[in-house]
Amino acid sequence: MTRFLLCSFALVLLYPSGIDMYLVGLPRIAQDLGASEAQLHIAFSVYLAGMASAMLFAGRIADRSGRKPVAIVGAVIFVVASLLCAQAHASSHFLVGRFIQGIGAGSCYVVAFAILRDTLDDRRRAKVLSLLNGITCIIPVLAPVLGHLIMLKYPWQSLFYTMTGMGVMVGLLSVFILRETRPTAHPQTATPQHGGSESLLNRFFLSRILITTLSVTAILTYVNVSPVLMMEEMGFDRGTYSMAMALMAMISMAVSFSTPFALSLFTPRTLMLTSQVLFLAAGLALSLATRQTLTLIGLGMICAGFSVGFGVAMSQALGPFTLRAGVASSVLGIAQVCGSSLWIWLAAIIGLSAMNMLIGILIACSIVSLVLLLVVTPPRVAQYDEEAAVES
């Protein structure tokens, strides 16, 4: 079991590392490539577009050909793309490299969740996904620090060489440590009754797609508007802003690492309801805030709400799928990436302020999710195939 957890964690961490590590070198990258920082900020969207593109096919391939081949190919693509970014001499080449890098990270991301679905039952999977969320929260804190230390002595290309090394390590883990976990039965050989229970259009799965997508949209909106809120509206300098973001990351980590213990005391539904109540409270606190302290409390509740509920919701979403876990993971990833991008784009088009953009998604997320949690209940455990057929 340890090998599956180690490989899954490594596969997932390529995604946030590819986002956070290069940001510290953005001014120098823009200078060397003859582009403005604003032009290169699109590299974030390009990276997410690459991830979404990979998710369109990676899950289906993983269900047909196995998790291990997709993990290996994804790691190789990430390595090649990181080298392309390091060798770029024009912004267009850099953006192409970032898109391909997103394809590699997206492939690995999908496979990681499929592996966890293959190897863990509902309760253990919810605990592991909560821990994984906590580990992922460490990356936004550590990656910029590591990037800064690297750039004290080396050029910005070294950031992508570091990512290359990470991709190589993930590839080696996938080749030598990871074992195939895809169930031996093929989806087309499943019985009609079994196949019906794994429909992507069943009401429970659709409800969890919406809940997780809204939750991801809320947390990404917070990340996107935090510089404007803290540095422009609250008057923080860069140092104070970094300290505040580190504090929020610590809240996320503390709650994520506590959630597995909470699952021993409370039901998953209780934790998911708590998550949405925290989102609602955060929205109300931000809308009523007249002091910085209340604003920071509201932002802290966003981090806590996401951390306590997201892993549990993802576990429930994947629960009904044994033979189609890869496709289900892909659908979840695509919905989350596209949904969050759509909201941020629409809010910018409408002209919402940073604070109103955040308050709007928090209120909408909490109300819609609370209704879904109260109305749409999980299928009976008997309908799940909790005994995963793991190939040795």
Curated annotation (Swiss-Prot):
InterPro entries: MFS, MFS_dom, MFS_Efflux_Transporters, MFS_trans_sf, Multidrug-R_MdtL
Any Gene Ontology CC annotation: plasma membrane
Cited SUPFAM superfamilies: MFS general substrate transporter (SSF103473)
PROSITE patterns per the UniProt record, alphabetical: MFS
CDD domains: MFS_MdfA_MDR_like
Transmembrane segments: 4-24, 38-58, 70-90, 95-115, 131-151, 158-178, 209-229, 246-266, 270-290, 294-314, 331-351, 357-377
Highest taxon of source: Bacteria
GO-annotated molecular function: transmembrane transporter activity
Transferase found in the keyword field: no
Keywords: Cell inner membrane, Cell membrane, Membrane, Transmembrane, Transmembrane helix, Transport
Predominant cellular place of this UniProt entry's protein: membrane
Locations listed in the record: Cell inner membrane
Membrane-related topology note: Multi-pass membrane protein
Family: Belongs to the major facilitator superfamily. DHA1 family. MdtL (TC 2.A.1.2.22) subfamily.
Name of the protein in its database record: Multidrug resistance protein MdtL
Organism of derivation: Klebsiella pneumoniae (strain 342)
